[in-house]
Amino acid sequence: MNSKDNITNLFGKSPINPLQKHMKQVHSCLKEFGVFAKAANSEDWEKAQLAHISIGKKEQKADVLKKKLRMNLPSTFMMPFSRRDLLDVLLIQDSIANITKDLAGLMMSRKMVFPKDFADDFLDLSKLCIKTSAAALVAINELDELLETAFSSRERKIVDKMIKKVNELEHESDVAQELIRNKLYLLEASLPPIDVMFYYRAIEWLGETADAAQKVGSRFEVMLTK
């Protein structure tokens, strides 16, 4: 019997694995947006619609995992962090899937195609947001290893490095957003005002997925200091 089994037998089923599964599902939702964004940029609306449907299904599955974890999470458990901490991370993770679904829905309903001046920049931003989410997933997946090693100094350094990577990628996404907004600002006068408003909204929502991924890492970091 390994150490993880011993922990489970002593303190009940660990909530860590369900949290990791939820983050994996959330990340798959954002990854699918990359497919959607490419299709929309090419005005391949049939392919975009398929990706949009897939995003919706993935978000629903993430929601099911979230509700299952919340319902089965004991009020107290023998972990070096609180139930509230775990629920906070869960809700932040879930916001990534929610924002992704809303963003794809907005772009699909309006058949949104960005001006050529920054269309590729938007795709680059989506890639950065996906990378940020992936880095947060890697960090969360290290949580059970931390517990098994009793928060050893070596393992903490590994996790700290992972969280630093999340922060760096999120900063890159901020820079990318600013670049797109600056380009859009220069084009505003030549574009329909309603389109401009929704372009800004789409850029903001996409950036919020990276912000949420960074918050997952930050919250994780706070949990480790308690």
Ranges and model annotations:
Residues 1-226:
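Cytosolic, long alpha-helical scaffolding segments
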